[in-house]
Amino acid sequence: MQEESSKELYSKAVKLIPGGVNSPVRACRNVGCEPVFIESAKGAYLTTVDGQELLDFVLSWGAIILGHTNSTVTNAIKKAASNGTTFGAPCKAEVLLAKEIIDAFPGMDMIRMVSSGTEATMSALRLARGVTGRNKVLKFIGCYHGHADPFLASAGSGVATLSIPGTPGVPEVTVRDTLLAPYNDLSTVKDLFVMYGKDLAAVFVEPIAANMGLIPPKEGFLKGLRALCDAHGTLLIMDEVITGFRVAYGGAQTRFDITPDLTTLGKIIGGGLPIGAYGGKAKYMEHIAPLGEIYQAGTLSGNPLVMTAGFETLQLLKDINYTILEKQVATFANELEVILKDKGVPVQVSNFASMFTVFFTNNELKSFDDVKTTNTQLYSILFRSMQKNNIFLVPSPFETNMVSFAHKEKEFEKALIAAKKIMFNITDVN
């Protein structure tokens, strides 16, 4: 078969697939270029169809933490596949993975596997509405909980209270019960509880916001949400699709000592294969069919390949010291910030655990409104220059870069050397 370049493949793809990609951000339009097509991946690196080896800080949007094609995980997948790729019936691996996840999260008694993070959040919302008999849900502006209609809401009129559809195709009635508040703004949340508390089924929150770049929670924010939910009989749902098993083995909730009513998971728990899950206290989870009255199902839920990959991944993570990688990332982020500041640009590199975001601003960042004021043109220059020098960052100024346990000192040094080669024009800075 004749080899084709990324450019040739993309020109074909745009005629066959909307935008040439199967998830919008991959098109790289936010950074002013076309996507590269990947041939293979190993450890901390991707290899494009053009033969370029890229140091990977995307890591399949956080789904990879051990490094690409970890031999233990891939060998387990091969063995599982030899016994059948899907059964449509229960298998041993789903029991093993379920127990592993439940043991990692102190407040979780039961878990249900699905095939994506969107399915997990959609199902958790349905469960919350079902057990409370309420319809309204509160989410935070800039936080992403998948593409189910109730979560695709934009801020409407009022003090971050009323919603309008965030995309065509979502009826206004669908987001009418979605309330919005700025992330880290507990005061607005309190006001919303005063107005709508008796109708509020759930509060959804990313414990560390990672879809508006990386914005950690302010001290007291998460505990304040827990207290408000307790006072009003509202379920607190932590979306740990990104942070679960990334910031700690038991997720962000163990870092911040917060026990939610329900938790949504994805990415890492699938070992690089498609997965989602939602779990929590038995008194809620027992309402899910066939045990209870709230329906949710899936043809490939509990797929044996995915369950095997996830279980093997978590087995390896149990014996890994997260603190070492966290310190390495913090050092790298600080050094990267110094390099970029020396080029005369306003910049800060936010980091937490094995995640970081380069924000081109000197302003304090605590919500999506703050993030929107950053210089996205400078980020586009950063992305293109780094990719030219074999470093693959997230192709959007509002996403979060990821680091794996396969990233060692030489990888961080390689990225810093590439950053030193970036040239910014004064017109871009202004």
From Swiss-Prot:
Keywords: Cytoplasm, Isomerase, Porphyrin biosynthesis, Pyridoxal phosphate
GO molecular function list: glutamate-1-semialdehyde 2,1-aminomutase activity; pyridoxal phosphate binding; transaminase activity
GO cellular component terms listed in the entry, alphabetical order: cytoplasm
GO BP of this protein: protoporphyrinogen IX biosynthetic process
Keyword DNA repair applies: no
EC numbers for this chain: 5.4.3.8
Pfam families registered for this protein in UniProt: Aminotran_3 (PF00202)
Record-stated family: Belongs to the class-III pyridoxal-phosphate-dependent aminotransferase family. HemL subfamily.
Name of the featured protein: Glutamate-1-semialdehyde 2,1-aminomutase
Species, as recorded: Lawsonia intracellularis (strain PHE/MN1-00)
